Swiss-Prot record:
InterPro entries: HAUS3, HAUS3_N. The keyword Coiled coil applies. Component of the HAUS augmin-like complex. The complex interacts with the gamma-tubulin ring complex and this interaction is required for spindle assembly. The gene is haus3. It comes from Xenopus laevis. One of its GO terms (cellular component) is cytoplasm. This is HAUS augmin-like complex subunit 3.
Length: 597
């Protein structure tokens, strides 16, 4: 409860007329004053209805004031009573009066003693009331804190139970992942890891693919070759030439014989062709000559037979020469040329053979590429599967290590929990029916905690739990104050940094007005600096003049005492009026004494 609320409650107890309309927050500032706080605490704890003057006495006092009669205070009333007693009491009763005075003094002392005791009791009562109020407030705060802590513990317990249940479910799920299935159907129904997958179908497909690839290779690279060779008798020699490209040495002689047979057939056919062409050419030439000379023969039929015979003999001789020349060409030159041309026959044959080999090689390379692609795919699938198994094995090993470390930590925590339980089951730590206020000497943990929180290493005879609680509260308050100070310092630091950044930005903008060039001085600043220089020169000149005037006035004051007195009076007039009045009074007295003399 705040101080303002306690003050308002006290006023309401004293039956203040407008106490219900007051707000305690409006009076909190009164308790911040150091001088007023003790009085206000005493007033809130000790004031009661007995300290309030009743309305009847107030009304009688007000009527006495309004009547105009004088109201004497305590001292004046005592003096009046003394004079009254002196004037009225006879001298015979002086002894009795002295006794009465002694009794009065004794009673006064007793009264003072009772008053002091009453004040002490009131102070004790006020302290007890204050302690009661504090204890009630503390009890309420403790109850609220207990409820909050209880609620927090319940929420924490629920969260902990939920987390533990989720951990148990997760562990069960994890154990179901790593558990060995009893049947293959259970494994194939819900595969979790790669190692749990059945690879029979995949391996059977790979075996079928490998068998198909093997049969394809045998058919197209081994068995298909013999079928292609045995398929036709006409292409036997060409295929034998192609087979030689694979490195078979048995068909080399057959190839040479075949080439010689082809060359010989080519030579014979070429020789016959040339002879036939020569005969046909001779026949064509004879026919053409006969056609051309038929008219001439008819015209010259009448010529002499002698000229004809001579002509016939000359023609026969020419014919014989031509035949001899033709025979020499056909027997000597033509066979050599035909043999040379027969050798040129090998070029298209060899070219065709090489073309066939190139086509076969291209076909084989394409088939080999297909086979290689299939093998590479198969190898890649196997390597990918192997990599997946290796990664899964590595993950399983990591999980195994982590589970081992978790099991070890759980064992250690279980051992520590057992140690704590055995420690807490100690008889000395059990709560007694009457809680102890002092800390037991065997409770070393509480003593060490007290030393740690208090920071005092001195040996104390008794240490209480209340002191430990107060030290802990003080530590928490210090921590809260330090956190508040840190927050305030961080805010001030951030504010200073922001101001510094803004000032730096302004300075940068001011020093770099055009972006890149540094401006040490601006025209405005240079003009102001020149103006300040001129003003400083004027000020210096004025200062020199003032110093000259001061020196001159000092010389005048030193030489003239009247001016010194005048100066002193001016100083007193502005600084010390009392001194001026005393001096003026002295002067007036002197002038008055001189005039009377």
């Amino acid at each position: 409860m705040s101080g303002g609320d306690r003050f308002v409650q006290t006023l309401q107890k004293l039956n203040y007329p407008k106490g219900a309309q007051l707000d305690g927050e409006d009076f909190d500032w009164l308790f911040e004053a150091v001088d007023l706080k003790p009085f206000l605490d005493w007033f809130c704890s000790a004031a009661s209805e007995q300290n309030v003057v009743p309305d009847e006495k107030l009304q009688a006092f007000n009527t006495l004031k309004e009547s105009g009669k004088p109201v004497l205070d305590e001292k004046a009333l005592d003096e009046v009573l003394k004079t009254f007693s002196i004037s009225k009491v006879p001298a015979i009763e002086e002894v009795a009066i002295e006794k009465l005075e002694e009794e009065v003094k004794a009673l006064q002392k007793q009264k003072n003693l009772h008053i002091r005791r009453r004040n002490k009791l009131q102070m004790v009562e006020s302290g007890n009331r204050q302690m009661c109020l504090k204890s009630k407030d503390k009890e309420e705060e403790t109850g609220r804190a207990f409820q909050e802590v209880l609620h927090l513990l319940r929420v924490t317990n629920k969260k902990l139970n939920h987390e533990l249940q989720s951990i148990v479910n997760g562990v069960q799920t994890l154990m179901s992942f790593f558990s060995t299935p009893e049947t293959a159907c259970e494994l194939s129904s819900q595969p979790i890891f790669l190692s749990q997958l059945l690879l029979d179908k995949y391996l059977s497909l790979e075996e079928q693919s490998t068998a198909a690839l093997t049969s394809f290779t045998k058919e197209h690279f081994f068995e298909g070759m013999s079928k292609f060779v045995e398929g036709s008798d006409e292409n036997f020699q060409l295929v034998q030439l192609n087979v030689n490209s694979f490195g078979e040495d048995g068909t080399t002689e057959d190839k040479c014989k075949e080439m010689m047979r082809l060359q010989l057939a080519y030579i014979c056919a070429k020789h016959k062709l040339i002879q036939m062409k020569a005969k046909s050419a001779s026949l064509k030439v004879g026919l053409q000559w006969a056609e051309n000379n038929a008219s001439v023969v008819q015209d010259k039929a009448s010529q002499k037979e002698e000229n004809l015979k001579v002509r016939i003999t000359s023609l026969k001789n020419e014919t014989l020469q031509i035949e001899n020349h033709t025979n020499s060409i056909s027997n000597e030159k033509l066979p050599g040329l035909v043999r040379d041309n027969a050798q040129l026959l090998n070029m298209p044959i060899v070219k065709g053979d090489y073309d066939l080999q190139m086509a076969h090689q291209t076909s084989c390379s394409s088939r080999q590429d297909l086979v290689c692609d299939h093998l590479m795919k198969q190898k890649a699938s196997f390597e990918l599967l192997q990599l997946g198994y290796e990664l899964e094995l590595r993950k399983h090993r990591d999980v195994y290590r982590e589970l081992g470390s978790i099991v070890q930590e759980l064992k250690e925590s279980g051992d520590k929990l057992e140690e704590r339980l055995t420690m807490l089951s100690d008889v000395n730590l059990l709560s007694a029916s009457k809680p102890r206020s002092n800390i037991d000497s065997k409770d070393l943990t509480s003593h060490r905690l007290y030393q740690l929180l208090d920071g005092d290493n001195t040996q104390k005879l008794f240490r209480t739990y209340d002191g430990l609680e107060s030290v802990a509260q003080k530590l928490s308050q210090d921590i809260a104050s330090m956190r508040d100070q840190l927050e305030v310092s961080e805010q001030e630091h951030s504010l200073l940094l922001s101001k510094l950044d803004s000032h730096l930005k302004e300075l940068r903008d001011f020093m770099y007005p055009e972006g890149n060039t540094l401006m040490l001085t601006t025209p405005e600043l240079s003009g102001e600096f020149h103006q300040l220089g001129s003003q400083l020169e004027k000020l210096n000149h004025i200062t020199v003049e003032i110093l000259g005037d001061l020196q001159l006035k000092r010389k005048m004051l030193e030489s003239n005492k009247l001016q010194q007195i005048e100066k002193q009076l001016y100083v007193y007039f502005f600084q010390n009026e009392e001194q001026l009045k005393s001096i003026v009074g002295k002067l007036e007295a002197q002038t008055g004494g001189g005039s009377s003399a």
